[in-house]
Amino acid sequence: MSNQEKKMHEEELQQQETVEADTEAEAEAVGTDADIEWNEESALDETEAKIAQLEAALLSSEAKVKEQQDAVLRAKAEVENMRRRTEQEIDKARKFALNKFAEELLPIIDNLERAIQAADTESEVVQPILEGITLTHKTFIDTISKFGLKEINPEGEAFNPELHQAMSIQESADHESNTVMFVMQKGYELNGRVIRPAMVMVAK
């Protein structure tokens, strides 16, 4: 083989090596680009997963906050209801603490009124006594009325079963039907609660 042929052969080998090197470089470049693209997709997937986790955690936190807010509102409502009930019970106890005591006073009032009605107003001897009893009765009524005790004296009024107790029913040309003709015994109420109904005669 001549020198010229050797030289040409070497040049061909060099060209072939250069082509192979370029091919390998291109292959490596393509591989690198694929790796970069894969890494980017992997990072994106990981980011989206973290975002999803954060969103789920946020929703869970919001739900817990809502539950706690509802619990606080319920607790406040229960406290308010308890406070209102307590105030009502205290007010009720205050109003009706004298209920039993007032019931015990009613016979005394009845006896004073019977004494006034039975007294001989024409007698000079009885007159001073009657005045004393009348004054005592008035003072007594004025005093107990300050504590919410009120008499029920419904003569001439329509019969009310919540306030009156019908002891007798009679026909009457002078009264409308279901009207109280006569009060046999006055009734009393304490702060709006009947402690004794009025005993009455009702027109038929």
From Swiss-Prot:
GO cellular component: cytosol
Main location: cytoplasm
Cellular localization per UniProt: Cytoplasm
Tagged with keyword Disulfide bond: no
GO molecular function, one term: protein homodimerization activity
InterPro entries the UniProt entry points to: GrpE, GrpE_coiled_coil, GrpE_head
Alphabetized SUPFAM superfamilies for the sequence: Coiled-coil domain of nucleotide exchange factor GrpE (SSF58014), Head domain of nucleotide exchange factor GrpE (SSF51064)
A GO BP annotation: protein folding
Residues covered by region (Disordered): 1-37
Compositional bias of kind Basic and acidic residues: 1-12
Keyword Lipid biosynthesis: no
Keywords, ordered alphabetically: Chaperone, Cytoplasm, Stress response
HAMAP family linked to this entry: GrpE
Function of the molecule: Participates actively in the response to hyperosmotic and heat shock by preventing the aggregation of stress-denatured proteins, in association with DnaK and GrpE. It is the nucleotide exchange factor for DnaK and may function as a thermosensor. Unfolded proteins bind initially to DnaJ; upon interaction with the DnaJ-bound protein, DnaK hydrolyzes its bound ATP, resulting in the formation of a stable complex. GrpE releases ADP from DnaK; ATP binding to DnaK triggers the release of the substrate protein, thus completing the reaction cycle.
The family this protein is said to belong to: Belongs to the GrpE family.
Subunit structure: Homodimer.
Protein name per the record: Protein GrpE
Organism for this UniProt entry: Vibrio proteolyticus (Aeromonas proteolytica)
Lineage, broadest ranks: Bacteria, Pseudomonadati, Pseudomonadota, Gammaproteobacteria, Vibrionales
